[in-house]
Amino acid sequence: MFYPFYEVIAEVGLPALFHTGHSGIGSGLPGGGGIRLKYSNPMYVDDLAVDFPELTIVLAHPSFPWQDEALSVALHKQQVYIDLSGWSPRYFPQQLVRYAMLRDRVLFGSDYPLITPDRWLADFAEADFKDEVRPLILKENAARMLGL
């Protein structure tokens, strides 16, 4: 259904961003506000990454509760990135923090106004990321991905 749209995005070199995981939207509402969590599993993006290998894809948020699936897709598909928006770094699962093989494909994101950049950065400073990975996450990976 959206493949013509993805073709255009890939052709002009723009990244496609997909919200993955449980972000809290609809929590506590009757029926979860109609949000079907199964569609936020990052494994659904794997097919798109296969069909459009030239399309840069960003998995927004740490993909809770599917962090391992997100890490697997990003490790397997070189054009897939993970952004860290929507969650305070103090709550990141250890496998996300320690997954060194993806150090070049993890991106900063605050998801403002839900989390202010100042709060996110303060929590990031306390997280257990290696010092050499911090500038990659905060700037260098995004600059490279965007061709800046």
For each feature predicted by the language model, list its residue ranges.
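Catalytic pocket-lining loop regions of alpha/beta-barrel enzymes
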Residues: M1-L107
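Conserved, mostly hydrophobic/aromatic
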Residues: I9, H61, I82, D111, ...
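Short glycine-enriched loops at secondary-structure junctions
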Residues: F64, P113-L114
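Mid-to-C-terminal alpha-helical segments outside catalytic/metal-binding sites
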Residues: M101-R105, I115-L148
